[in-house]
Amino acid sequence: MSETPAQCSIKQERISYTPPESPVPSYASSTPLHVPVPRALRMEEDSIRLPAHLRLQPIYWSRDDVAQWLKWAENEFSLRPIDSNTFEMNGKALLLLTKEDFRYRSPHSGDVLYELLQHILKQRKPRILFSPFFHPGNSIHTQPEVILHQNHEEDNCVQRTPRPSVDNVHHNPPTIELLHRSRSPITTNHRPSPDPEQRPLRSPLDNMIRRLSPAERAQGPRPHQENNHQESYPLSVSPMENNHCPASSESHPKPSSPRQESTRVIQLMPSPIMHPLILNPRHSVDFKQSRLSEDGLHREGKPINLSHREDLAYMNHIMVSVSPPEEHAMPIGRIADCRLLWDYVYQLLSDSRYENFIRWEDKESKIFRIVDPNGLARLWGNHKNRTNMTYEKMSRALRHYYKLNIIRKEPGQRLLFRFMKTPDEIMSGRTDRLEHLESQELDEQIYQEDEC
């Protein structure tokens, strides 16, 4: 039986047609859902892949790390050979260099190295994903409040059928609640109560120790009417108020127990650097708990008024002063009783804080190297109150010492110099002439700047 042309075409279409893949993923498997990383973020991370030993913050790089980074950049970006001797410094000193400093040290590749370093600094900034979609077991909100829970069982209990009361008790670990609050340990946040008659009086303590239920956390963050300041971050460490999972249905809420427990609050004072609080499970924390009731607080059978409740809130606060680690201040280069440049250079060479600017290459032979010419010029400018001092201007003063055979430039070496005399020998000579030459040089610079 012959087929009509229309039937043949329909048959061919059926054979060649393949149904498209369903855009809806299958949830039959028990594997967790992986959210793909945005393409722009993935491209930014894949654009520069440093070696494993260089993936620390550049501020922690050693001198060898800086040399290896230069070698890697030279190969990665097909740059001209870079003289690593011009970058003999650690990561801290590398971050002090400006773009002009990079160009001065490496005329052909300095701008690329500077932009590469800035890109690495941006790439090393921590990224925080605030969406709870990435962590179904945790509840992470943005600015209003951040609540971190170490236990994932509580959220899973929402979907389970209720068990007998004996099985419903779970001894969960303490929760850590990090909230944005004002300077005062007593918060002024008052959420509207569903029934004002049942809740005649709500102290700030009740709002402060209030913990979100899993059903409330699933609804996302709520808008806050309070003023969120960044100066203070109260951190409350407390046991769970309710050690049982709520019922799976929200239409039958359980009445709250008549007795609740207050929390012990550890409040971190404002500090430039916030250190993490490490809770060691081996050392138990003794929380002195006071019993609260919904219809008015009672303690030993006597009612407690509002002032006592505020005192209770203050008693349950532990003020922890978090101070940043001691860091050496950036040297500004001012040295007392030091007028001449050669003496100033000797003083800097004797101080280890200035090794990123100038250092001894061979102390016995009195050979020194200027590591950061522009930085050294800025230090000399601060010392002489010349904010526009440059290395070119400072090198003019150095040339006077060439003529007097005090300092000599090493032949064939860049930024390498040698003292031809000891400080005692220099002081025994005519220092008044040196002072006159240097002051004359500064006066000429000021005159030229005024002319411009």
UniProtKB/Swiss-Prot annotation:
Recite the UniProt keywords alphabetically.
Acetylation, Chromosomal rearrangement, Disease variant, DNA-binding, Isopeptide bond, Nucleus, Phosphoprotein, Proto-oncogene, Repressor, Transcription, Transcription regulation, Ubl conjugation
Q: Which InterPro entries match?
A: Ets_dom, ETS_fam, Pointed_dom, SAM/pointed_sf, WH-like_DNA-bd_sf, WH_DNA-bd_sf
Q: Which Pfam families has this protein been placed in?
A: Ets, SAM_PNT
| Site location (Breakpoint for translocation to form CHIC2-ETV6 in AML) | K11, Q12
Query: Where does the entry annotate site (Breakpoint for translocation to form PAX5-ETV6)?
Result: R55, L56
Q: Which GO MF terms are attached to this record?
A: DNA-binding transcription activator activity, RNA polymerase II-specific; DNA-binding transcription factor activity; DNA-binding transcription factor activity, RNA polymerase II-specific; DNA-binding transcription repressor activity, RNA polymerase II-specific; protein domain specific binding; RNA polymerase II cis-regulatory region sequence-specific DNA binding; RNA polymerase II transcription regulatory region sequence-specific DNA binding
Q: How is it modified after translation?
A: Phosphorylation of Ser-257 by MAPK14 (p38) inhibits ETV6 transcriptional repression.
Consequence of substituting R369Q:
In THC5; abrogates DNA binding; alters subcellular location; decreases transcriptional repression in a dominant-negative fashion
The record's listing under CDD domains reads: SAM_PNT-Tel_Yan
Where are the Phosphothreonine modifications? T18
Q: State whether keyword Transcription applies.
A: yes
Pinpoint the Glycyl lysine isopeptide (Lys-Gly) (interchain with G-Cter in SUMO2) cross-link.
K11, K288, K302, K403, K421
Where in the chain is the site Breakpoint for translocation to form ETV6-AML1 in ALL? A336, D337
Which residues does UniProt assign to the signal peptide?
none
* Gene3D superfamilies linked: Transcription Factor, Ets-1 (1.10.150.50), Winged helix-like DNA-binding domain superfamily/Winged helix DNA-binding domain (1.10.10.10)
Q: Enumerate the residues marked as the site Breakpoint for translocation to form ETV6-MDS2 in MDS.
A: L54, R55
Instruction: Return the SMART domains for the record.
Output: ETS, SAM_PNT
Q: Which family does it belong to?
A: Belongs to the ETS family.
Q: What does this protein do?
A: Transcriptional repressor; binds to the DNA sequence 5'-CCGGAAGT-3'. Plays a role in hematopoiesis and malignant transformation.
Q: Which disease is it linked to?
A: A chromosomal aberration involving ETV6 is found in a form of chronic myelomonocytic leukemia (CMML). Translocation t(5;12)(q33;p13) with PDGFRB. It is characterized by abnormal clonal myeloid proliferation and by progression to acute myelogenous leukemia (AML). Chromosomal aberrations involving ETV6 are found in acute myeloid leukemia (AML). Translocation t(12;22)(p13;q11) with MN1. Translocation t(4;12)(q12;p13) with CHIC2.
Q: What quaternary structure, including any partners, is listed in this protein's UniProt entry?
A: Can form homodimers or heterodimers with TEL2 or FLI1. Interacts with L3MBTL1 and HDAC9.
Q: What is this protein called?
A: Transcription factor ETV6
Origin organism is Homo sapiens
Q: What is the lineage of its organism?
A: Eukaryota, Metazoa, Chordata, Craniata, Vertebrata
